[in-house]
Amino acid sequence: MKYGEDVIAALTICWTVLGMPAGKRLAPMLTELVAVLRHFRELVISDETAALLVSMSAATIDRRLADERARYKIKGRVGTKPGSLIRSQIPVRTWAQWDDAVPGFVEIDTVFHDGGNRGGGHAFTLTVTDIATGWTESRSLPDRTAKHILAALNQIAAAMPFPILGVDCDNGSEFINDDLLAWCQDRRITFTRSRPGNKNDGCHVEQKNWVVVRTVVGYYRYDTASELLLLNEIWRLQSQLTNYFHPQQKLVSKVRKGAKVSRKHDTATTPFHRATDHPSMTLDRIVALKRTYSLINPAATQRQIQALTNQLFTLTTSKAPAGVPTPLTKRARSREATNNPSRAS
C-alpha cells in the first residue's frame, strides 16, 4: 500500500509524542492515540488519512520511520553505586516471596546527575517502577540522605494509583539502612533486596532509568536548586506521558534452543490500561484514572516537557567552566522492549 506524505507526517507526530517507540509498541496504540490527538486538534487530518494511519503494521512503521530514527541514535550510560549496611535484616528477593502479578510491588533505584564527575554535590533521581503495570514515578533529590529518599518515597506513594505493597532495591547504602527499613515496617510494606552481583534482579527499574530519565534529561551535571526545581517539574509532566500514553511490552516467555534464545512479548499497552484492566483495582481508583486520562493532551504535554528541558540544558551549559567542553550526549536513545534482553516491562 502506498502512503502519502500526509500519512507519514501524521505518523511522525504520533511517534514523537510517544517517545519514539519501535513499531511493535507504536502500532497497537495508534487507534487510541490518533483519536486523542484529533480530539485536541493536534492532528488535523481527514478520516481517510486517519484510517490509513491506524492500519499501518509494525514493520511498515519501522520502515517509514527509519530515517527519522537514525537522527536520534545517541548512546550513554547510567551510574549507580553499590553499598552495604544492614543486609542481614532485609531478605534477599526470591520469586516465591514476590508477586509480580499484583500492582503495588515496586523496584526502586537512583540515577546520578554528575555529568561524568562524581566529585562534589549533585542531584540524583529516584525512580520507582511497579512490576505488574510498569507504572513509573520519578523524583529528583539534592542528595541520597535518608531524609530526602523518604520524602521522595512519600510523594511517590501518594501519586501511585494503588498502594505500595512491596519495595525491592539494590544493595546501595541509600536503601540498605534503618530508616528505609523502618519506613517499610511502619507501613507493612514487604522490603527485599536484590542478590549481590545480580544486576538483572532490578531490571524493570533499570530500564526505566534509561527510558524515562536519561532519554529526557540526559547526562549533564545538575547541582543547583534551580535545576532541581526544573527536574521535578519535568517528572510531574513526564509521568502523564509515561503512564498514560507510552506503550510498553512485557516479556511473556524465553526459550533457549542451543545457542539461540527466542523471546515472546505481549501486545504493547500502557501502564494506565494495565492498571485499569487489573482485577485488583477498585472502581473508585479506575474512575479517577480515567478522569485524569481524559484531561491529558499528550502533544501539549510533550511540548511543555521540551520547553522545560531546554531551560534545564541552558542552565547547566551556561555554568560550565571555561575550557571544559560541553557534553555531546544530551539524551540517550531509548532501548526498545523487543530488542532488550532483560525482563523489564
Residue ranges of model-derived segments:
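Secondary-structure boundary/capping micro-motif
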Residues: 1-166, 171-345
